[in-house]
Amino acid sequence: MQVLVRDNNVDQALRALKKKMQREGIFREMKMRGYYEKPSEKRAREKAEAIRRTRKLARKRAQREGLMSNGRISALR
């Protein structure tokens, strides 16, 4: 990964590098590889993440359609 340093502004270059690494998911990858994860634990984690994504998408769809307001399902009258 490469970041240009302009006008000897190292702080700005570090912020840009950190933002790129965050976008690429490098910090998350480093955290996950910090210790061994058993294959069964990996499957369970990935399944839980998929469920979380699905629920989040369903919430967004419901909110877009006007069925929800502020995270709660409004009563249909």
Curated annotation (Swiss-Prot):
GO biological process: translation
A GO molecular-function annotation: structural constituent of ribosome
Intrachain S-S bonds: none
Presence of the UniProt keyword Amino-acid biosynthesis in the record: no
PROSITE patterns to which the protein is assigned, alphabetical: RIBOSOMAL_S21
GO cellular component: ribonucleoprotein complex; ribosome
The organism's place on the tree of life at top rank: Bacteria
Disordered: region residues: 55-77
Keyword tags: Ribonucleoprotein, Ribosomal protein
InterPro entries with a match to the protein in the record: Ribosomal_bS21, Ribosomal_bS21_CS, Ribosomal_bS21_sf
Record family assignment: Belongs to the bacterial ribosomal protein bS21 family.
NCBIfam families per UniProt: S21p (TIGR00030)
Name of this chain's protein: Small ribosomal subunit protein bS21
Organism this protein belongs to: Bartonella quintana (strain Toulouse)
Upper taxonomic lineage: Bacteria, Pseudomonadati, Pseudomonadota, Alphaproteobacteria, Hyphomicrobiales
Name of encoding gene: rpsU
